[in-house]
Structures are given as C-alpha cells and as structure tokens.
C-alpha cells in the first residue's frame, strides 16, 4: 500500500486472471459513492460466528479451477442493484479507494488477511460491496489449497474481531 500514492488500488492473487476488459470502469463507477471503501468479487453479507466466510451465504460470481473441478461459481444472481453490501470479501480480488493499514502484525499468510482487512474497512466506517456481474470478471486458478495455518489464523481473527468466539 505504501508503494503507491494512487487513490485506487487493486490487490489480486497471483493465480487470478481477469476476464472483463472494461471492469475498471465499473469499479470507478461504484467508487463514485464515497461511502464505499472496498470492492470484492466474492463476499458474504453476514460473516458467520466461526469467522469462516465460506460458511456463510455468499454473493458474487467467478470462474474457479482447482484440483477437484473447473466451474463457474455463482453465489448470487441478484441483479436488482448494481452491487450488494457485504461484511467480508475473498482476497482473490480486492479493490480499494482508501488506504487502511493491513493487520500484518496479526496475519502473515494466506488466511484471514482478507476478512481482517474487510473488518478494518467496516471499523473505519466504509461499506464493502460485491458488484452484480452478468458473467464472472475473473478466473481463479487455485490448484491445491494450502490450509496449514488456517485454524491458527482463524483463532487470531476471532480473538481480534469477534470477541474470542471460538466455534
């Protein structure tokens, strides 16, 4: 974040391929609302008590490819609004218009840095949204999942943001 003074920043996994050429225009259109701080492509409207975003009802749309399958993941087809407000987004793609410090003091790996950053944006008073997409804006070619430290970081997340709720 400190490497650039750009107002808008996009954080993207190394295994994500963008498929919508003009997505930046959609992102800028959404960011015209100054109350929106972050945009993701997959998120949850209500973060579950166990802190695991993937255990909640998700919204968004991506193509996904991993060791088990290759498919279009559709979590929501609600096209009544240009976007849906969420409590957390997946870190595969995060666009921001404000600089909120990452909690590198707590999260040093692949797990929970994204949900933590989502909580930091909410604490700062900003909305987090997932845009309506008629087709996915990216392919996530995740291959093998490495969850070696997932439970460790989940407990840290729960302690920091959810009062130690250890479901």
Where in the sequence are the language-model features?
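A recurrent flexible, glycine/aromatic-enriched loop bordering the glycosyltransferase active site
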Residues: 73-96
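Short, conserved alpha-helix that lines the donor NDP-sugar binding/gating region
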Residues: 1-2, 119
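Short, high-confidence coil segments that cap the C-terminus of an alpha-helix
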Residues: 6, 35-36, 126
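C-terminal catalytic/acceptor-binding lobe
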Residues: 88, 105-167
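Active-site acidic Asp-centered loop
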Residues: 12-14
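A generic structural signal for short hydrophobic patches within well-formed alpha-helices
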Residues: 99-102
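Conserved donor NDP-sugar-binding/catalytic core segment of glycosyltransferases
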Residues: 17, 22-62
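Short aromatic/hydrophobic "clamp" motif used to bind/position activated sugar donors
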Residues: 9
């Amino acid at each position: 974040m400190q490497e650039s003074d750009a107002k808008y920043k996009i954080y993207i996994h190394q295994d994500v391929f963008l498929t919508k050429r003009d997505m930046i225009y959609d992102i800028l259109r959404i960011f015209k609302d100054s109350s929106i701080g972050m945009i993701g492509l997959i998120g949850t409207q209500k973060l579950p008590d166990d802190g695991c975003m993937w255990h909640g009802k998700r919204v968004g749309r991506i193509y996904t490819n991993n060791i088990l399958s290759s498919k279009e993941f559709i979590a929501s087809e609600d096209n009544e609004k240009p976007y849906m407000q969420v409590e957390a987004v997946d870190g595969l793609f995060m666009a921001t218009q404000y600089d909120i410090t990452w909690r590198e003091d707590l999260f040093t790996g692949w797990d929970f840095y994204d949900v933590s950053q989502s909580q930091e944006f909410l604490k700062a008073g900003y909305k987090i949204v997932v845009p309506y997409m008629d087709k996915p804006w990216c392919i996530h070619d995740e291959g093998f999942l490495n969850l070696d430290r997932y439970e460790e970081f989940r407990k840290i997340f729960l302690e920091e943001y959810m009062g130690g709720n250890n479901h």
